[in-house]
């Protein structure tokens, strides 16, 4: 049998997208919508606006598998369901062939002086550095510009590499060569390990909580 990558969420159980059994399978894509499923990519700030083809936005879906609402939570239901369409909270894009790609979670998006920065994109680039074993990107408040954030990278180095200022400078130089200036991490913190779920997914929220506690905030 074949193993095909797909996509779905609890509110659209069990699945909304799948790579085709017969036909082209694209690396990094969750495939195309399954039959009777409608999908559109909408503006992150205004779900009534559809973004141009190839641009990132929030994934919105409609179909028989979309849930009817949250039990006894009418406000949450109203926030997530719009005329039968569900706002997924996932940032994605569609290519010219109708294949969809997941970019990141909306809640993890970083606002750098009005520019949208997606942590996963930066993490994928940093994983290409020979010294990096694991990495997580989050946004931290910019005290000079309320409502804006600065990019911070938590880095776990591979065995044999030293946690030095020289290594931080090397990583920043690597970022400057491979990222737009506003995406380059302003802060780099070395750690021996990153908080992860049982299946190995980095928990960015725990890192955000650590930063909040350092600022004296309650979490």
Region locations from a protein language model:
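Glycine-centered tight turns that cap/initiate beta-strands
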Residues: 36, 131-134, 181, 187, ...
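AMP-binding/adenylate-forming catalytic core of the ANL superfamily
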Residues: 63, 68-69, 91-182, 200, ...
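Acidic/polar alpha-helix N-cap and adjacent early helical turns
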Residues: 210-219
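Sparse recognition of residues in long alpha-helices and their boundaries
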Residues: 93, 187, 191, 215-216
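Conserved AMP-binding/adenylate-forming
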Residues: 1-6, 10-100, 107-109, 123, ...
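Solvent-exposed beta-strand sheet faces enriched in polar/charged residues
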Residues: 6, 42, 103, 138, ...
């Amino acid at each position: 049998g074949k193993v095909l990558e797909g996509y779905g969420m609890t509110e659209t159980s069990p699945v909304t997208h799948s790579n085709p059994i017969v036909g082209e399978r694209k690396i990094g894509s969750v495939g195309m919508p399954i039959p009777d499923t409608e999908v559109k990519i909408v503006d992150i700030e205004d779900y009534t606006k559809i973004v141009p083809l190839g641009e990132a936005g929030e994934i919105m879906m409609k179909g028989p598998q979309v849930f009817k609402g949250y039990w006894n939570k009418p406000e949450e239901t109203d926030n997530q369901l719009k005329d039968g369409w569900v706002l997924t909270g996932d940032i994605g894009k569609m290519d010219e062939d109708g294949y969809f790609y997941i970019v990141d979670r909306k809640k993890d998006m970083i606002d750098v002086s009005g520019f949208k920065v997606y942590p996963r994109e930066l993490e994928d680039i940093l994983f290409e550095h020979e010294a990096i074993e694991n990495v997580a990107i989050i946004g931290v408040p910019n005290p000079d510009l309320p409502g804006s954030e600065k990019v911070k990278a938590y880095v776990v180095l591979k065995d044999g590499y030293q946690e030095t200022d020289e290594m931080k400078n090397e990583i920043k130089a690597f970022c400057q060569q491979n990222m737009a200036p506003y995406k380059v991490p302003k802060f780099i913190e070395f750690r021996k390990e990153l908080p992860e779920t049982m299946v190995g997914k980095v928990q960015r929220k725990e890192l955000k909580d650590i930063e909040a506690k350092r600022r004296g905030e309650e979490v």
